[in-house]
Amino acid sequence: KKPENYGGMVQLKGPSQDFFNYFLEFKRQKGEMFGQSSLGLSNIYTTKLDFAPKDNLKFSLMYQLAEEDNWLNWIQDNFFGIYKRKQKTTVASINWFGGDKHELRLKAQMVGFTARDPLPFVSNTIGDLNKVEANIDPFTLSDLAFQVRYRYEILPLAYLYVVYSRGGRIIEFDQENSLKEIYKRPWNEPQADTFTVKVRYRF
């Protein structure tokens, strides 16, 4: 008997170097190792690149694509939808250090999630799913977390911080498939857009 959750993966890692590193992974699984089960198998492709042209400067980029044909989504009460799911995630960062006094960090995490071809189901008292006649809309989720942080050492144990943050989450009931357009939505209509300056002294 197969376990409720199972899967396998193939990984390729580049040589460990200070200048350049890369990581590739393909994963096929049903459910999560320490999470909920799922109706079917999902495919997850991940690639990550690290580039450090100088000792005090590093660039990092990660991209992941997850696909699942029978993604189960709870809507309300005992009403569920089964969708074709795609999730595209991009994480980019830049870290720079100017001696002992200056530190600049930039990080952006963007998620584009699409749920298409929805089918409606209801569950009975023992958890079985039964297909019903109902209308469910496909939807698109956009998520952004962007931050730039600068730190300056004024005196020993005294620091100036300048932080800019922007982001949010937007859900639209549409079939937009352009990753560029999906990523742009929370940037153009942010739920958070803050600029902070503070001084901290450690006693």
Give short role names for the model-derived ranges.
Residues K1-F203:
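Exposed, low-structure sequence patches enriched in small/polar residues
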